[in-house]
Amino acid sequence: MARKSLIQREKGRLKLENKYHFIRRSSKNEISKVPSLSDKWEIYGKLESPPRNSAPTRLRRRCFYTGRPRANYRDFGLCGHILREMVNACLLPGATRSSW
């Protein structure tokens, strides 16, 4: 189990990312449209104004069940340990153990 403080920190980052998503996207679109370098620098300044934790690269995908940050499978939202346990217990529909 991940520490609860880390999970809450990640939730806060997700809220910030959703809040500033439109500002970042519009600034990046403006940069590609503006031909002059001085105007681009001004827009880069706007990109630096939102908080650091609002950047999408600061987010980390976590296991839905345990909060573990590593070995996550996007399709299920689970880490490898829990995924294996759930497949063995036949709790995930459509997922089977491989055998050859």
From Swiss-Prot:
Main location: plastid
A Pfam family reported for this protein in Swiss-Prot or TrEMBL: Ribosomal_S14
Source taxon at top rank: Eukaryota
A GO molecular function held by the record: structural constituent of ribosome
Subcellular localization, as worded in the UniProt entry: Plastid
Record's keyword terms, sorted: Plastid, Ribonucleoprotein, Ribosomal protein
GO biological process: translation
Repeat listed as a keyword: no
Entry's Gene Ontology cellular component terms: plastid; small ribosomal subunit
The keyword Secreted is assigned to this record: no
Role noted for this protein: Binds 16S rRNA, required for the assembly of 30S particles.
Entry similarity comment: Belongs to the universal ribosomal protein uS14 family.
Assembly behavior: Part of the 30S ribosomal subunit.
Name the record gives this protein: Small ribosomal subunit protein uS14c
Gene: rps14
